[in-house]
Amino acid sequence: MFDTLFKSIFGSSNDRYIKRCRTRVEAINALEPQMQALADEDFPARIAEYREQAQNGRSLDDLLPEVFALTREAGKRALNMRHFDVQLVGGMVLHEGRIAEMKTGEGKTLVATLPVVLNAISGLGVHVVTVNDYLAKRDAAWMGRLYNFLGLSVGVIVHGLSDEERKEAYGADITYGTNNEFGFDYLRDNMKFYPHQLVQREHNFAIVDEVDSILIDEARTPLIISGPSEDSTGLYRRVDDIIPKLSPEAHFSVDEKARTATLTDEGVAKCEELLGIDNLFDPGNITFQHHVLQALKAHHVFRRDVDYIVTPEDQVVIVDEFTGRLMPGRRFSDGLHQALEAKEKVKVEAENQTLASITFQNYFRMYKKLAGMTGTADTEAVEFQQIYGLQVITIPTNKPMVRKDYPDSIYRTRREKFEAIVAAIGELHKSGQPVLVGTISIETSELLSAMLKKTGVPHNVLNAKHHEQEAEIVAQAGQRGKVTIATNMAGRGTDIVLGEGVRESGGLHILGTERHESRRIDNQLRGRSGRQGDPGSSRFYLSLEDDLMRLFGSDRISGLMQKLGMEEGEPIENRMVSRAIENAQKRVEGHNFEIRKTLLDYDNVMNQQREVIYTLRRETMMEADLEETAVEFMDDLFDEIYGDAEQGKGSEGDDAKAYAMARLRDVFNITRVLPLTDGQLPDRETARGAVLSILDELKRDTGEVYRDILRFFLLEEVDRCWKEHLLNMDHLRDGIGLRGYGQRDPKQEYKREGFSLFQEMLFRVRENLFRALTRLRIQREEQAPPEELKQEFKHKEEPKSLNYSGAQKETPSAAPERRGEPKVGRNDPCPCGSGQKYKKCCGA
């Protein structure tokens, strides 16, 4: 009540923000005559002048009016496009690190040039993030004319570039690319060996186009670089053969909401009989159990031409549920992709093991300043604020919106609904009004296409199978009498321009064949019509058999429709029913938000560990002399070995001193210079001196290559142990939910045990480093020249068999050796959570 009264008097916070921007818009407009008087060659000189002022301490906020005015004039001359006043406001929103919600056709691509130019002046680089390679190349070439006119350099990052080309693109003032390419380049940089191999600069400022698609829709899917693991392809085929012999309900049940399958007791017994094993739940048979559940999902949850397609080359390719695009190169996780390959009787590819991973949430939060643009963000404003700290500002349209959004037409069955859709399309086609038909799957678009062919209505189909003609089909969709069927239009990035005489016949009509589980995707489809004040209309056709209605809202809506007494083929258009559907969508959105938030909570634990490892790698790469680091690592190990001996800790069957001597032999190969024949543990300083003498001998034998040897072995061990650690964390994550049954918080347990595993991993790095160094011998009489030695100790090149995917990976492996209590090394992060190294905090 109070909020409503406050808004009626003072306006919403959004209105007040827009009002505050008007003063600066007037200041920019006042500078227009001054900029119009400049000669073309004056523009790069002005940018150089502003760059110098910024370097001398003048703030970008202070420079904003002049730079925006200069960019607006450059747009007129280079592109023949002038920024509207509302676009200037959009530019201010982006510069301040917020999200600008702008309707379709309001010129988001042009708006981005304003903050891009302003922030490029700093010389620290600006990243413009798009949803696909086509848009990255298109926008870089299109807006590049404006940037080049101003004397700024532009780079573009797309799939298939070499490291040299990527480095050059990142070195430009402005870099366009996709979210996947930026994320994978970050991960790849943290697998490199020498500083000159790094391609990315620091993460200064990013503008994310279609920000809702990238930061929300794709946030459930982490970026993963993986390599091949053990081959278990035969097992997938063996398990797939038994699935047709299992009966629904009797042997298994499917939860469509959660997209899971579960075996019944009878199903477990049947599987044991068919697989010829005694106990499916025996630890030795855990792999069978996992494969059976994945095979059930492949057969009864995932649908061909909806969730994936099979290409003419017999490859299973994922279909993006939000955009309808194919995602070649990405694979479902947890062996699900292999289960689908077995189901479709194509070649089953080997499983992969995670080498590096990050979520989009944590990648984009690394930027000093982050901003975004989209046509539909307001429905997710709370999530943007909570997770990314980004405020959504709705920018007014340049011309009033006149599109008519009609109420939903709801039918009892899918058959009735599709018959009504075909009839409606036929009527609209006769009248000359173009129709864009939105479907949520390839299966539906092809079904509708077949029905239209029978009635003789000419039409185009745009889905993941026909993406080559995408831009051409979309561009023609606004012509008189055109009928275009398209899977989800999110991120298509091509405006639909109305043809001659179309405005008079009502503009483009949007016909939705089903509600998506996200209101935002529905709004994106609607937003294709009514751009820049054009006329248009929209209507959704639904049935009680649609997935959303069936799973999330059917009982209540079905009851309402029975009360209203519907006849066969008769639609209902009722606001109460539409509200019930919207509430069902809100429930699904809330459910998906919780999934993303949980993913982030768990990834935050991994993120802290990732930062420590990547910082260690970066310091190892950059450090000219690693000898001091090696000695510190050695002292950490001595602290542990001699500390355990003093406290009487040993392994089973060994006394503490015997165990300490065994560790000295194993880790440091100490008997090479110090015999331990009398069974006495040498004092710490004697043992330390012995290890230093081994290192000194290695240093004398290798000369200047010694530093490269230290770097090589340290990076090798960090990478190998980190890879194993990622696998162990995957296993921990998979089983941690069960802790809830023991009245323990799974997230806290994951954090606690994850920290323990991480500390052990850091100690394994130190141990393995010294195992390698103290056993390395150089034959003096056959000693290689320094250059050959350098080549010998160069880091291995990136394996060619790496996979880049957007899903979590899990493969079974033996549990790591566990110590009783994790030790904290002096260079490790302090357990108190201060963020400092232990030696500078509690260990000082």
Curated annotation (Swiss-Prot):
SUPFAM superfamilies: Helical scaffold and wing domains of SecA, P-loop containing nucleoside triphosphate hydrolases, Pre-protein crosslinking domain of SecA. It is an enzyme of class 7 (translocase). Zn(2+) binds at C830, C832, C841, C842. GO terms for biological process: intracellular protein transmembrane transport; protein import; protein targeting; protein transport by the Sec complex. PROSITE patterns: SECA (PS01312), SECA_MOTOR_DEAD (PS51196). It is a peripheral membrane protein. ATP binds at Q87, G105, E106, G107, K108, T109, D495. It is found in: Cell inner membrane; Cytoplasm. Residues 783-800, 816-826 have a biased composition (Basic and acidic residues). It catalyses: ATP + H2O + cellular proteinSide 1 = ADP + phosphate + cellular proteinSide 2. GO terms for molecular function: ATP binding; metal ion binding; protein-exporting ATPase activity. It comes from the Bacteria. Part of the Sec protein translocase complex. Interacts with the SecYEG preprotein conducting channel. Has a central role in coupling the hydrolysis of ATP to the transfer of proteins into and across the cell membrane, serving as an ATP-driven molecular motor driving the stepwise translocation of polypeptide chains across the membrane. Belongs to the SecA family. This is Protein translocase subunit SecA. It comes from Nitratidesulfovibrio vulgaris (strain DSM 19637 / Miyazaki F). The gene is secA.
